[in-house]
Amino acid sequence: MEDFWEDWDLAFEDVFPKSLKEALEGIKEIPTYGERGASRFMYNLLKLEKEKRKEIIEKVLEAVEVLRPCRECFLITDREVCPICSDEKRSKKFICVVEESQDAYAIEKLERYKGVYHVLQGHIAPLEGISAEDLTIDALMERIKKYQPKEVILATNPNVEGEATANYIAGLIRRKFPAVKITRTAYGFQFGSLIEFVDEYSLEKSMENRK
């Protein structure tokens, strides 16, 4: 019986489409997208009708062109200053510090918090080569100096990186602005969770029970 594992004439590189390989490599440049995530995204996209694929890609390209960080809080928005920072009814006496825009939007869905946000655009992670200087911490200190908030709420993710980031920022605030109250969101969910994926009830309790 002929062995089907032998006499293979074509190399994998000859079979796998070059355009697909390049697309996957491009997707993998997006943070948190590895080989598996990129493949899942691309193959699911290819299952759609051609017109639907085109529609999705056009929407993504349009969003990339208009979206930018708010010049005040760094929340992703389609304006120079986001609706939250430009809303006079929002109290600048409360600044909620989050790692990413999606965390702020998760809290906004609760429709309870009436302060403003500050998006760090990441977290401190030495093993990944991310230091405090790579985040928007300096801008946060400037906002605290400018607005003299009553309270700064540290709502970084409940994981090792989030804790390290929160502790670093808390130390800075204590040294520079000793009169400012610093609170940390309570753990109403499992350590290692991401705020953007936490259910609304748990997130609301975490904000309410901050200390």
UniProtKB/Swiss-Prot annotation:
Keywords: DNA damage, DNA recombination, DNA repair, Metal-binding, Zinc, Zinc-finger
Coiled coil (UniProt feature): none
GO biological process: double-strand break repair; recombinational repair
Residue intervals of every C4-type zinc finger in the record: 70-85
Keyword Zinc in annotation: yes
GO MF, one annotated term: DNA binding
Keyword ATP-binding tagged: no
All copies of domain Toprim, residue ranges: 93-190
InterPro entries named in the record: DNA_Rcmb_RecR, Rcmb_RecR, Rcmb_RecR_Znf, TOPRIM_dom, TOPRIM_RecR
Function in brief: May play a role in DNA repair. It seems to be involved in an RecBC-independent recombinational process of DNA repair. It may act with RecF and RecO.
PANTHER family: RECOMBINATION PROTEIN RECR
Database matches in HAMAP family: RecR (MF_00017)
UniProt record similarity statement: Belongs to the RecR family.
Descriptive protein name: Recombination protein RecR
Gene giving rise to this polypeptide: recR
